[in-house]
Swiss-Prot record:
Organism: Homo sapiens
PROSITE patterns found in the cross-reference section: IG_LIKE
Glycan-carrying positions: N88
GO CC, alphabetical: plasma membrane
GO terms classed as biological process: immune response-activating signaling pathway; interleukin-13-mediated signaling pathway; negative regulation of apoptotic cell clearance; negative regulation of mast cell activation; negative regulation of MyD88-dependent toll-like receptor signaling pathway; positive regulation of apoptotic cell clearance; positive regulation of interleukin-4-mediated signaling pathway; TRIF-dependent toll-like receptor signaling pathway
Stored Pfam families: SIT (PF15330), V-set (PF07686)
InterPro entries, alphabetized: CD300_family_receptors, Ig-like_dom, Ig-like_dom_sf, Ig-like_fold, Ig_sub, Ig_V-set
Keyword S-adenosyl-L-methionine: no
Functional description taken from the UniProt entry: Acts as an inhibitory receptor for myeloid cells and mast cells. Positively regulates the phagocytosis of apoptotic cells (efferocytosis) via phosphatidylserine (PS) recognition; recognizes and binds PS as a ligand which is expressed on the surface of apoptotic cells. Plays an important role in the maintenance of immune homeostasis, by promoting macrophage-mediated efferocytosis and by inhibiting dendritic cell-mediated efferocytosis. Negatively regulates Fc epsilon receptor-dependent mast cell activation and allergic responses via binding to ceramide and sphingomyelin which act as ligands.
Protein name as it appears in the record: CMRF35-like molecule 1
Amino acid sequence: MPLLTLYLLLFWLSGYSIVTQITGPTTVNGLERGSLTVQCVYRSGWETYLKWWCRGAIWRDCKILVKTSGSEQEVKRDRVSIKDNQKNRTFTVTMEDLMKTDADTYWCGIEKTGNDLGVTVQVTIDPAPVTQEETSSSPTLTGHHLDNRHKLLKLSVLLPLIFTILLLLLVAASLLAWRMMKYQQKAAGMSPEQVLQPLEGDLCYADLTLQLAGTSPQKATTKLSSAQVDQVEVEYVTMASLPKEDISYASLTLGAEDQEPTYCNMGHLSSHLPGRGPEEPTEYSTISRP
């Protein structure tokens, strides 16, 4: 019985020392994506001891997140930092970039031989308020998305139309080229007679020298002079147009001066190709009265 009372007394004294040697806020609130600061105060005599910040509702199972180095230099680990102000006997814990999962029970503690000193701090995280920029960003994104869809719809309509127009132009150009080629082939396939065919209405008139039958060319010249005196009528021959390289001659012979003149229409078309040599024979035609 006296031994049990002694244990209870020691436990009460130990708990009293824990509570009175270090103090801190009971509850601390923070905003999501924000930060919070916790200040813990300790009594004189603990300035050079190590201070720590741990997480967990159970004292023995809490996980130390950050610890001082025994000086006033700030120590940071991940999103948590701690700094000891030994003159004011306070150490400050800062948690940054808060998340909803950071809400839990934490401890402000002092490391010492035997049981450490500590006090609990309840941390709660409130949702961050929705700003006006975030609210207006959704319609902007929606409008931008709709604008992109509208542009894509226009392209889906215009591209087939442009392709169809280009295809029609290509077909039209092909037909035009085919017809021109066919026309050239048809023109190249014309016969020489068609190429050399004279135009209608193109008449050639030639003055023909009249010779009497049975006379030589010299006598014919003399007789022609006398015939001119007697106003002998001159015969005319209508001839079709001939190529320049084809030369035709016509000779007319009269039996007597009192005989009536004879008229003859002569036409000669060359069936030979253009460009024949000058050595080709000359054609002559003689017309006599019966």
